Amino acid sequence: METRAIVRGVRLSVDKGRPVADLVRGKKVDQALNILEFTQKKAAVIIKKALESAIANAEHNDGADIDELKVKTIHVEQGATLKRFSARAKGRGNRISKPTCHIFVTVGN
């Protein structure tokens, strides 16, 4: 049985989120949480929250045993880009792009 958790619109670049997701793909849930706990990246904190949500969904909705769960799939997709303006010299302006992403986590036996 597979259970999902989706986090959308996270203020994180896809290029910074995917390497952290690769660290925990296919691992047991307790091992994945341990890896994310000691990974010093902003993405690790966000992905850990998504993984904890997927675990809670599996336990509450499906009655799954937490000790047997594994991270089946985890992927980070590109979201909308927030475009901002920064004033520059001589009346000019530059665009600042603030990327977002969507995180999809699936856990199962």
UniProtKB/Swiss-Prot annotation:
What start and end residues bound the annotated signal peptide? none
Q: Which GO terms describe its cellular component?
A: cytosolic large ribosomal subunit
Q: PROSITE patterns annotated for this entry?
A: RIBOSOMAL_L22 (PS00464)
Q: Would you say which domain of life the source belongs to?
A: Bacteria
Q: Which Pfam families match?
A: Ribosomal_L22 (PF00237)
MF terms (GO), sorted A to Z? rRNA binding; structural constituent of ribosome
Arranged from A to Z, the UniProt key words for this protein are: Ribonucleoprotein, Ribosomal protein, RNA-binding, rRNA-binding
S-S bonds: none
Gene3D superfamilies cross-referenced by the UniProt entry: Ribosomal protein L22/L17
Which GO biological-process labels does this protein carry? translation
Assembly with partners or alone: Part of the 50S ribosomal subunit.
Q: Which family does it belong to?
A: Belongs to the universal ribosomal protein uL22 family.
PANTHER family the record matches = CHLOROPLAST 50S RIBOSOMAL PROTEIN L22-RELATED, LARGE RIBOSOMAL SUBUNIT PROTEIN UL22M
Q: What does this protein do?
A: This protein binds specifically to 23S rRNA; its binding is stimulated by other ribosomal proteins, e.g. L4, L17, and L20. It is important during the early stages of 50S assembly. It makes multiple contacts with different domains of the 23S rRNA in the assembled 50S subunit and ribosome.
Task: Tell me the protein's name.
Answer: Large ribosomal subunit protein uL22
The organism named in the record is Methylibium petroleiphilum (strain ATCC BAA-1232 / LMG 22953 / PM1)
Tell me what gene encodes this: rplV
